[in-house]
Amino acid sequence: MSKRAFNFCAGPAALPDAVLQRAQAELLDWRGKGLSVMEMSHRSDDYVAIASKAEHDLRDLLDIPSDYKVLFLQGGASQQFAEIPLNLLPEDGVADYIDTGIWSKKAIEEARRYGRVNVAASAKEYDYFAIPGQNEWNLTKDAAYVHYASNETIGGLEFDWIPETGGVPLVTDMSSDILSRPLDVSRFGLIYAGAQKNIGPSGLVVVIVREDLLGRARSACPTMLNYKIAADNGSMYNTPATYSWYLSGLVFEWLKEQGGVTAMERRNRAKKDLLYKTIDASDFYTNPIQPSARSWMNVPFRLADERLDKPFLEGAEARGLLNLKGHRSVGGMRASIYNALGLDAVEALVAYMAEFEKERG
């Protein structure tokens, strides 16, 4: 097999080699059963065991309290932008949202279709280069919930703190930083995460929801979007994304073998520290984000001359450093360094950055 490239894509993102190798080994014949997981009935004993183990391992990794349901749903995180207000926002209620970038803005726009939204704080005041401190937030006392995106994959902003909401349920889009380090799940009413960054392949979204928030859906909420129905049916009201669920379970097993989220925190800290140190030590590369708000998972950076972007990307690809082009709305470069990428990937990237700067700077 040819050497695998280092994939810095924001999503769908790199998966651990060990997970892909195991999936390959089990592709045609899962544990001597003579069929692929893709061919299994989702209601068979074998598949139910696969699904149950995935949930058990995720609960173990994040130490999820027993009064929370873990749902493996379809539609990605973007569908949650509608599903959350349909389940949690009364028609005469108001929801607080924090705007820190493109994904939180999309959530705000969708929620406004279903009810009143109060944008309690916005990073726009800081050109989206910093996160407003909670002393700047204008929260609604009796809000149905407070929503924020813990990490903005495009802009590269990440909360390094959990907001205080005074008993109002806290809802977070954790698509790109879930499982990157330890988390106190009990601080949240609901956590959701699209799988294709730090969990597994696309086609799946994981929702962790406190049980007392179930059963609040509007009467007009579609059956398929009702959290309580999903919970009551073990996320199998209809056929789930079976293979994505299975692969996510393999990722959870791999994470436990690596030492869990505490080990991931050490690994991810080393990666992001090396990359930001390289950028900050250079006059050729820049990252505009306030240091306290810099993302551990998505590191945007610019070259001194944007005319060098194309040759930089071409040189990177020739060295097996893939998908470093920044989002079209931001430009520049972006290195997404999720759990599956090791320190060796970042070491290879910074070595190339130094080489390119020496030649073109």
Curated annotation (Swiss-Prot):
What Enzyme Commission number does this protein have?
2.6.1.52
UniProt xrefs under CDD domains: PSAT_like (cd00611)
* MF annotations from Gene Ontology: O-phospho-L-serine:2-oxoglutarate aminotransferase activity; pyridoxal phosphate binding
Gene3D superfamilies annotated for this entry? Aspartate Aminotransferase, domain 1, Type I PLP-dependent aspartate aminotransferase-like (Major domain)
Q: Does the keyword Transferase apply?
A: yes
Tree of life domain: Bacteria
The alphabetized list of GO BP terms reads: L-serine biosynthetic process; pyridoxine biosynthetic process
Where found in the cell?
Cytoplasm
Q: Give the CC-aspect GO terms.
A: cytoplasm
Which positions does UniProt annotate for pyridoxal 5'-phosphate binding?
A: A77, S78, W103, T153, D173, Q196, N238, T239
So, what pathway does this thing act in?
Answer: Amino-acid biosynthesis; L-serine biosynthesis; L-serine from 3-phospho-D-glycerate: step 2/3; Cofactor biosynthesis; pyridoxine 5'-phosphate biosynthesis; pyridoxine 5'-phosphate from D-erythrose 4-phosphate: step 3/5
Protein keywords: Amino-acid biosynthesis, Aminotransferase, Cytoplasm, Pyridoxal phosphate, Pyridoxine biosynthesis, Serine biosynthesis, Transferase
Record's InterPro entries?
Aminotrans_V_dom, Pser_aminoTfrase, PyrdxlP-dep_Trfase, PyrdxlP-dep_Trfase_major, PyrdxlP-dep_Trfase_small
Which cofactors does this gene product need?
Answer: pyridoxal 5'-phosphate
The entry marks the following residues as binding L-glutamate, namely R43
List, alphabetically, the SUPFAM superfamilies matched: PLP-dependent transferases
Q: How is the cofactor bound?
A: Binds 1 pyridoxal phosphate per subunit.
Catalytic activities: O-phospho-L-serine + 2-oxoglutarate = 3-phosphooxypyruvate + L-glutamate; 4-(phosphooxy)-L-threonine + 2-oxoglutarate = (R)-3-hydroxy-2-oxo-4-phosphooxybutanoate + L-glutamate
Q: Which residues carry this modification: N6-(pyridoxal phosphate)lysine?
A: K197
What top-tier enzyme class does this entry carry?
A: transferase
Q: What family does this belong to? A: Belongs to the class-V pyridoxal-phosphate-dependent aminotransferase family. SerC subfamily.
The record describes its quaternary structure and partners as: Homodimer.
Q: What does this protein do?
A: Catalyzes the reversible conversion of 3-phosphohydroxypyruvate to phosphoserine and of 3-hydroxy-2-oxo-4-phosphonooxybutanoate to phosphohydroxythreonine.
In its UniProt entry, what is this protein called? Answer: Phosphoserine aminotransferase
